[in-house]
UniProtKB/Swiss-Prot annotation:
Disulfide topology: none
UniProt cross-references to InterPro entries, sorted A to Z: DUF47, PhoU-like_sf, Put_Phosphate_transp_reg
Organism the protein comes from: Methanothermobacter thermautotrophicus (strain ATCC 29096 / DSM 1053 / JCM 10044 / NBRC 100330 / Delta H) (Methanobacterium thermoautotrophicum)
Family, per entry: Belongs to the UPF0111 family.
Protein name: UPF0111 protein MTH_1689
Signal peptide: none
């Protein structure tokens, strides 16, 4: 009985951890809208809120690691679950890093890139939501989890295309003296940080894929 109680507890913490990562991203969406408007005060406040949520996600992850160490789940399943949790946690890490980069630079957002950034944020949001649904489906519907893995791959490819478009545009704007060197470098770094969110989400989905493959035998 105690063994199953451990599994129930770690599954509960897994859901909580996933929700915290989702909350980090939702706050980051708010932050980017504030960034477009030039609201540095709100960007700073939201960065702090994201840092708190990322810390809370870390605390939940540590609890889960202790529960795994104490024997939750069978050994053949335990390692894959630990790796999945760590991969999901890295998504929160890169969200916090992107938020900090935006907040630190205090760069005035160049309006000509607003539509492309919103497009990248939209597809990044789809990637994060698909990851959330993928992980939830691991316990209920492996076929649906697999479909979400493929969705994440497509979304990450879309994010890469938009990232390249933005960076190409930034180089063009810099060469034509529409933006200065400091803004160019800051915006390029921010672009890469935002794109990195989808990259880490795809990494987490790769861990989910391993679990799916093993369970299907």
């Amino acid at each position: 009985m105690k063994f199953f109680l451990k599994e129930s507890k770690v599954e509960k913490h897994g859901r909580q951890h996933l929700e915290k990562v989702m909350e980090c991203y939702l706050k980051f969406e708010e932050l980017m809208e504030a960034f477009y408007r030039g609201d540095c005060r709100l960007v700073s406040e939201l960065t702090k809120e994201i840092a708190i949520k990322e810390h809370e996600a870390d605390e939940i992850r540590r609890k889960m690691e202790l529960e795994f160490y104490e024997g939750a789940f069978l050994p053949f399943d335990r390692e894959d679950r630990i790796m999945l949790v760590e991969s999901i946690d890295k998504v929160a890490d890169v969200i916090e890093s992107a938020a900090f980069t935006v907040s630190l630079g205090k760069v005035a957002f160049p309006a000509e890139f607003r539509d492309d950034f919103r497009a990248m944020m939209k597809v990044t949001g789809k990637t994060i939501r698909a990851l959330h649904e993928c992980v939830e489906s691991l316990e209920t519907d492996l076929g649906e989890a697999m479909r979400k893995v493929h969705e994440i791959e497509r979304f990450e490819d879309e994010a890469d295309i938009i990232e390249r478009k933005i960076i190409t545009g930034l180089y063009s704007a810099y060469r034509q003296d529409r933006i200065g060197v400091v803004k160019f470098l800051d915006m390029k770094e921010i672009t890469r940080k935002v794109a990195n969110i989808s990259d880490r989400a795809e990494d987490a989905s790769d861990r989910a894929l391993i679990i799916i493959a093993k369970r299907r035998g």
